[in-house]
């Protein structure tokens, strides 16, 4: 079980990312565009640097939906490998069966 503060901080980061996502995309498009003037590109870079660090998507950590475990995360289920195995054995995941060959 992850600390509640870590889970809360990650949720806060998700909210910040959502708030700044549109503006960040606009600024990055300006920076990448080869037809942009050097002055506009520099202004866009400065504005991007002024935004909070937590506005970047890469700072959000994928965590287990049940207990917040940060490692062994399976995107398809939104769970860690440990929790996915437990729930699959109990039959709580529809369409998931134990493999046999």
Curated annotation (Swiss-Prot):
The keyword RNA-binding applies. It holds the Pfam family Ribosomal_S14. GO terms for cellular component: small ribosomal subunit. The keyword Manganese does not apply. InterPro entries: Ribosomal_uS14 (IPR001209), Ribosomal_uS14_bac/plastid (IPR023036). One of its GO terms (biological process) is translation. It comes from the Bacteria. Binds 16S rRNA, required for the assembly of 30S particles and may also be responsible for determining the conformation of the 16S rRNA at the A site. This is Small ribosomal subunit protein uS14. It comes from Corynebacterium efficiens (strain DSM 44549 / YS-314 / AJ 12310 / JCM 11189 / NBRC 100395). The lineage of its organism: Bacteria, Bacillati, Actinomycetota, Actinomycetes, Mycobacteriales.
């Amino acid at each position: 079980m992850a600390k509640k503060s870590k889970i809360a901080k990650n949720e806060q980061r998700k909210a910040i990312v959502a708030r700044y996502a549109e503006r960040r995309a606009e600024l990055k498009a300006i920076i990448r565009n080869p037809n942009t003037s050097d002055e506009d590109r520099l202004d866009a870079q400065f504005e991007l640097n002024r935004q909070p660090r937590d506005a970047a998507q890469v700072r959000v950590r994928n965590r287990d939906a049940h207990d917040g475990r940060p490692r062994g995360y399976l995107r398809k289920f939104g769970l860690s490998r440990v929790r996915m195995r437990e729930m699959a054995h109990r039959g709580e995941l529809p369409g998931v069966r134990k493999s046999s060959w």
